[in-house]
Amino acid sequence: MRVALVFLVLSILAATHGDTNLDMERKEADESSLSEMKEMLLLQELQAVEAALFGKMNVENDENRDFREKRCGGYGMSCKSVQDCCGELDCRKDPSTWIDHPYCLNPKKG
């Protein structure tokens, strides 16, 4: 009778202990699947943000793709204002010529 009682207690303990291991494995599997789902959601959010940022950059580049930076005029080039001339050149009429158009010339000294 004692032997049967011992086996009964051992079988009950084994069954309850085995169930806890299975429950723990199920919890770990659920947690890992949840963490994978969270990672996938985070990845999708990051991809959406990246697409939005790079999309804006591409739109700006598309808008300005035909725009070319204005070049400055060198010495002796015709100009309309000082901003048209490179560096420290002045946009002024050359008194030594009969042409009325201003040119990029060296600044007056003094």
Curated annotation (Swiss-Prot):
Major localization class: secreted
Keyword Nucleotidyltransferase annotated: no
Tissue pattern of expression reads:
Expressed by the venom gland.
The cellular location(s) given in this protein's UniProt record come to: Secreted
Q: Which residues form the signal peptide?
A: 1-18
A GO molecular function held by the record: toxin activity
Keywords associated with the record: Disulfide bond, Ion channel impairing toxin, Secreted, Signal, Toxin
Is DNA repair there in the keyword field?
no
- Cystine crosslinks: 72-86, 79-91, 85-104
A GO cellular component annotated for this chain's UniProt record is: extracellular region
* Biological role: Probable ion channel inhibitor.
Q: What is known of its domains?
A: The presence of a 'disulfide through disulfide knot' structurally defines this protein as a knottin.
Q: What is this protein called?
A: U12-hexatoxin-Hi1a
Report the source organism: Hadronyche infensa (Fraser island funnel-web spider)
User: What phylogenetic lineage does the species belong to?
Assistant: Eukaryota, Metazoa, Ecdysozoa, Arthropoda, Chelicerata
